[in-house]
Amino acid sequence: MDPSRRPPKDSPYANLFDLEPLMKFRIPKPEDEVDYYGSSSQDESRSTQGGVVANYSNGSKSRMNASSKKRKRWTEAEDAEDDDDLYNQHVTEEHYRSMLGEHVQKFKNRSKETQGNPPHLMGFPVLKSNVGSYRGRKPGNDYHGRFYDMDNSPNFAADVTPHRRGSYHDRDITPKIAYEPSYLDIGDGVIYKIPPSYDKLVASLNLPSFSDIHVEEFYLKGTLDLRSLAELMASDKRSGVRSRNGMGEPRPQYESLQARMKALSPSNSTPNFSLKVSEAAMNSAIPEGSAGSTARTILSEGGVLQVHYVKILEKGDTYEIVKRSLPKKLKAKNDPAVIEKTERDKIRKAWINIVRRDIAKHHRIFTTFHRKLSIDAKRFADGCQREVRMKVGRSYKIPRTAPIRTRKISRDMLLFWKRYDKQMAEERKKQEKEAAEAFKREQEQRESKRQQQRLNFLIKQTELYSHFMQNKTDSNPSEALPIGDENPIDEVLPETSAAEPSEVEDPEEAELKEKVLRAAQDAVSKQKQITDAFDTEYMKLRQTSEMEGPLNDISVSGSSNIDLHNPSTMPVTSTVQTPELFKGTLKEYQMKGLQWLVNCYEQGLNGILADEMGLGKTIQAMAFLAHLAEEKNIWGPFLVVAPASVLNNWADEISRFCPDLKTLPYWGGLQERTILRKNINPKRMYRRDAGFHILITSYQLLVTDEKYFRRVKWQYMVLDEAQAIKSSSSIRWKTLLSFNCRNRLLLTGTPIQNNMAELWALLHFIMPMLFDNHDQFNEWFSKGIENHAEHGGTLNEHQLNRLHAILKPFMLRRVKKDVVSELTTKTEVTVHCKLSSRQQAFYQAIKNKISLAELFDSNRGQFTDKKVLNLMNIVIQLRKVCNHPELFERNEGSSYLYFGVTSNSLLPHPFGELEDVHYSGGQNPIIYKIPKLLHQEVLQNSETFCSSVGRGISRESFLKHFNIYSPEYILKSIFPSDSGVDQVVSGSGAFGFSRLMDLSPSEVGYLALCSVAERLLFSILRWERQFLDELVNSLMESKDGDLSDNNIERVKTKAVTRMLLMPSKVETNFQKRRLSTGPTRPSFEALVISHQDRFLSSIKLLHSAYTYIPKARAPPVSIHCSDRNSAYRVTEELHQPWLKRLLIGFARTSEANGPRKPNSFPHPLIQEIDSELPVVQPALQLTHRIFGSCPPMQSFDPAKLLTDSGKLQTLDILLKRLRAGNHRVLLFAQMTKMLNILEDYMNYRKYKYLRLDGSSTIMDRRDMVRDFQHRSDIFVFLLSTRAGGLGINLTAADTVIFYESDWNPTLDLQAMDRAHRLGQTKDVTVYRLICKETVEEKILHRASQKNTVQQLVMTGGHVQGDDFLGAADVVSLLMDDAEAAQLEQKFRELPLQVKDRQKKKTKRIRIDAEGDATLEELEDVDRQDNGQEPLEEPEKPKSSNKKRRAASNPKARAPQKAKEEANGEDTPQRTKRVKRQTKSINESLEPVFSASVTESNKGFDPSSSAN
């Protein structure tokens, strides 16, 4: 029903009997020729009440709404589906009978249900078709189920015909039945029309009889008015009889319902119409799910009044408590005519859409499909055409490509045969290579055999030479074996022939033996000729010099074939005794050495005395020279060549043990040497009363003054520390070899330092006739032993034995543990140190500079010179970091002038301990004396002054009337009263100087009468005021832009600024009190500071620098008075507690054990100073906190010096323990910069020390060694490893500390022997400081590997730890074990050409004494290194320390140096050094390590300078 026509809710039945709308109601006209009816019987009610949803009014069946209960609203799609075009359906008789039977059966069932459920009585059911029933719809309408069962129209058969909507079509049309109908009155004027054929169908279809049908009650649910009733009656559109083909007669039209009722009244027996409304029907309008049956209008949340059926729970006068539930939304029912029209519009729209959209769409689809078919057909045609063309083209192409294919086949065959030929060539090359290798192996075997024969030749030649030289002494010296005589050769070697086997000798061996004998004979003959010629010439010179008699040659026969400990030239029996000229006692092994030297001299052999360092080689050589003078009457001249550091030692030892032998110390400047050369006159030599018997000089001077020494025929040449001639290509070696001397003796503790070539150089130097081929010697011995030491390979023991056999006749080697049982033990301890945090940062930063893997891969194993230098530079930098970070750039401290004399005070307390602050023991050079009488009568009597009359005058009266220091008198003295205002002051009185001191008259008077402490306090305060003026000036300069240029204004501003900065001298407690500004003290009040405080706090650091490093400082002027009270007064003033607090921040009193402030009231000046804090700090407070109890005067920062180096911290602890144990220490370092740091450390610790390095002169060396040996108060001797490790006797020390190890481990061994030698009475301990997990460990490991050869060759010979490093050595120092293994594996994979190129390189890395690396040619290096002095000459000291160099009398030495340079007598090493092209490691890296040749380091001698 239309909501607008709904009756009011308060009277739902108000318009029920309003007949006016009913009378005016017009029956709708039929719109179609098709008869429409209401809902068919398939719209069966499925509601909860179980009723049939079919509305009938006055016998007419109303059309049902086919909407489902599940659906909430009608949509356009549903409207389109529910079309109104219902077509007539034809039903056959059989079909009709079946439907009728089913209808009757359902009617019975529903009748039973109605009887069982009285409130829900059902009407007669409508027949239901099984063809087009609504299956998915729930029956119902908008009228809430009002029931009108049947219409009493006569067309019953047509009414029961099922109808479908437009979407459901049934082609079976039920035929119309033309029987007379029967009528069933159900009461209330409602009559049902029964078809006439019903009785006929009762029996056949088992239908209920007419009498069995009882209709009791019918309920119409919902609200009904006449309007809706008229619409229901009008819905019966077809009342006429249907024909079989579905075309019925048209229904008559009525103007109104009243007219229709009048027309139908004649046909109805009971035309009455009655309507009964029951409570159940009224209640049936309550929606399902309502809480109750009472209707209430309630305002919803959206603000709309809605009707709710509620249940009243509680009711009062002014309130109701109800329970409600929202009813389901009712569906709005449209007008059937509107629905039909809407459905027709939808059909029309559908057709329009079909015409407009679907037809066009299908046309497009058809067109597209047709186009696609066309395209596919064309494509297929193109494919077929292409295939055909390909076949045709292929047929044409085959003849054309035949030549191409033929050429390709030919080319493939050619490549195949080329490959085959190449493989065959490689196979042939392989076979040839194998054949060549086999031939090479045969050649090597043959060559090895030849080498063995040559070696045997050399060994036999050596022994035969020794045998001939030994037997030569038994015969006439003038006789010689004839060269062509064979019999003497067979006679002299009976033992050798007997020793050989009796079997037939090989002709080749026999020939070799013959060559050996003749070669030995030739060598003996040549040596004998040389010796005879020298003796003849010597005799002539002696006769010329009026010698007393002929030579008395005494020889000792016999030899034994023993090891180096007992050489083959050692006689079995000896008559040699200790010479009387030797004022000493020789030990047993020294007597054997003297005996061996005598025997070698008699045989004409030169020898090498290679005893271990410290066994007295110098003593044996001096005893041998005394033996020649005493037994053979040979008084020289003897030439002793030694390093510059031991020249004084030789002179002292000879004068001590052989006072009868005169020495000529040939060293000094050019003028001194010129005077000394006057004694080198052949006419004055060769006799006992000659001017000298032994000339002592250095290697460098010997090469420099070579032309003067060639004139002399030296009877014997002794070379001490003979490793200085280790290179046969050096100028030094060639010069000494060219000297005319009868015999040569080499003294060395390490005859082999770097390689086996050096051993050959020494052997060739002593026996040039035998050892004349260096290549063969190097090929026989050098390779195997060196490879074993470096790489751990197998060592040929037979090869080592052959080397021993060659060395037997010419070398005597003893070690300490074998020959000296009373020598003290030596213990070596390696102390591992940790790197400090600063060192670790430096070390890691330097190590990260380069990647070794990238370096190797980028060069394919080839290391360029520049990259090797870079790597070596990294190694050197890492070593410097391990020693001390300040080696890069020394943090030189600035020192003020300390005007005082510092005496040797007690040892300082341990670092960091807080001890009582005491004065450092310094004393002011200014001392004034006060007579005792003056002190007692004037100074001490402070209360009264005595006059000559004897009457006492009070001090106040005296100062008032007789004080010349009154401010008034001083002012008058400065400004005389007679000078006018406008006149220029031409002069002033006695106190006119005070204006220059910036002192007022009051301040001058105060200082004149105050005590010493008050003067000191005033000076500090006055200095602070001066500093405050500087602050004002700096502040004013920064504010110049805001100030006027007027000077007067600037002065005023400056004065005001100074007044603001000056603290108040008068302070009260009220001024110091904090006053709150509110009811409670704000928490942020402490954060607010004045601008003055901020300014003063900002300059605190700058002020500290001025305070702690003043320009000058001096102890108080010493006052000397013989009065005891004066001494007490001075001491009291100096140690006054408040004065100490002022200087150091606190004062220790006797009442407390710790530092605290004195309890007494401070001096006013101290109060004034304290009031200016934080500008003013205690003068020495910070220094005391840093340095502990040390004196405040320091030129460097020892705390930073110690904490920055882990080694120095370890050394500090070690030296304290050694000092406590009364030990004496030799401290060796390599770099001079490191020695400077150690020297500063010694000064800080107050250790007495001496320092010896390359800058020390010969005289200074002698004096320092002597002082250290005789003075027990000297605790430490600082030495350079290279300058102080040769020939110095320092047995007074029992501890050796290596702060840094040298690149050459031989130098470290020599340094150890400075203390561990004969004359040492204490056990020697050697400490070596090594940083953990650094490059130092690898350097030490490398040295230990090379020391292994020393044990292999001759128990003390071969040490390859030299100053020259190859690329592999440098890289190995920077890599760990894993990386080294990988690098070695990659190096093995290199081609042979690369390895050969690397082997052919003759450049090596040289490390000088300063730790710098240069790349030099190997030949030049050998020549220059062996031509230079291990220690620099005293007359030309070269040191990086300019202060020490300038201190060695530059005025006296400058002319000498100028003359030497003018005469061209500079050292060859220096000349070569300047000309040689060197490459510094710092060219590509940091300039700190510059090694380039400059004026300052020109001619630098690395062997003579310490690092």
From Swiss-Prot:
Polar residues bias spans: 38-67, 1491-1507
Disulfide linkage: none
GO molecular function, one term: ATP hydrolysis activity
Disruption phenotype: Decreased homologous recombination frequency, but unchanged sensitivity to genotoxic agents and efficiency of T-DNA integration. Differential expression of several genes. Compromised ethylene-induced H2A.Z eviction dynamics. The double mutant ref6-1 ino80-1 is insensitive to ethylene (ET) and exhibits reduced levels of EIN2 associated with a shift of the chromatin landscape to a repressive state at its locus (e.g. H3K27me3 and H2A.Z).
List of residues binding ATP: D611, E612, M613, G614, L615, G616, K617, T618
Domain Helicase ATP-binding stretches: 598-769
Domain DBINO: 350-475
Record GO biological process: DNA repair
UniProt feature, compositional bias: Basic and acidic residues: 428-450
Subcellular location: Nucleus
Residues annotated as domain Helicase C-terminal: 1210-1360
InterPro entries for this protein: DBINO, Helicase_ATP-bd, Helicase_C-like, INO80/SWR1_helicase, P-loop_NTPase, SNF2-like_sf, SNF2/RAD54-like_C, SNF2_N
Catalytic activity annotation: ATP + H2O = ADP + phosphate + H(+)
Family in the record: Belongs to the SNF2/RAD54 helicase family.
Function: ATPase component of the chromatin remodeling INO80 complex which is involved in transcriptional regulation, DNA replication and DNA repair. Binds DNA. As part of the INO80 complex, remodels chromatin by shifting nucleosomes. The INO80 complex controls ethylene-induced H2A.Z eviction dynamics. Positive regulator of homologous recombination, but not an essential component of homologous recombination. Not involved in the illegitimate repair pathway.
Protein name per Swiss-Prot or TrEMBL: Chromatin-remodeling ATPase INO80
Source organism: Arabidopsis thaliana (Mouse-ear cress)
Name of the gene encoding the protein in the UniProt record: INO80
